[in-house]
Amino acid sequence: GDVKEDSTYFYVIGAPDIAAVPAGLHQGINYIDDNTVTLVLYAPYKQYIFAVGEHSNWMLQEASYMHLDPDNATWWVTLTGLDVGKEYPYQYFIDGTLWVADPLAEKVLDPWNDSYISEATYPGLIDYPTGKASGIVSVFQTAQPEYTWAIPEFTPPADEDLVVYELLVRDFVAARNYQTLVDTLSYLKDLGINAIELMPIMEFEGNESWGYNPSFFIALDKYYGTREAFKIFVDSCHANGIAVILDIAMNHAFGQSPLVQMW
């Protein structure tokens, strides 16, 4: 008859290694070189944390067990041997029960909403690791392409001289992306404005929202486009003498936010 093989993986969790965060590193993702990343997470009152993801084949491994700083609140781990320029999805596994994305990630993958983002708006969006993870996962990538600014230095108008047009990307252009928004700059400039204030563009819950329900404060919501597309929009605004102001709701955090889930 047919023979089926299976395997079971056990990992015995010991006490975390106590070691100081290397000098010069900040909370979040630290790119050491093209093959190395150090992740730093502020998470007081936790017993142990693993950084689990594509780099560890989504398994608990000694190499992904985070060190605990002597402050008893900051966790860190250095991941080596990474492929240059590859996007790695990952999560934090905390105290044996909680899986969360990195609260300071600059990009996340959403199993519920990413499928509704068009290729035109976000070309080349990597697949969610279905069957390996659940919930939102964060992403790191070494050797990211550098954007060359056409306007490397921009002096915004004085506060008292600002003529601001506030807009919601979702409702202002039918395509709902930065690429199309760039095409409207001549119209906005003809109105006599010298600043555009964008309603929140950081990752919020769902795709269609005013943005005042943020879940990741420094990750751009992919529904409006890529980081490069956003930079092109800002660069184009500056080329037209238009400042860009971001509406940020720092006092809000909703259920998908790791900062909510962790406490």
Q: Would you name each region that the model predicts?
A:
Residues 1-3:
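Short, solvent-exposed loop/turn segments at the edges of extracellular beta-sandwich modules
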Residues 17-24:
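Proline-enriched interdomain boundary motifs that mark the N-terminal boundary
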Residues 5-15:
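C-terminal edge beta-strand
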Residues 33, 40-87, 95-119:
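Aromatic-rich carbohydrate-binding modules that target alpha-glucans
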Residues 5-7, 36-38, 74-76, 164:
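Intrinsic-disorder/low-complexity, polar/charged segments enriched in Ser/Thr/Lys/Arg/Asp/Glu/Gln
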Residues 98-151, 260-262:
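Core domains of carbohydrate- and sulfate-ester-processing enzymes
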Residues 108-113, 145-146, 150-162, 168-263:
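Substrate-binding/active-site clefts of carbohydrate-active enzymes
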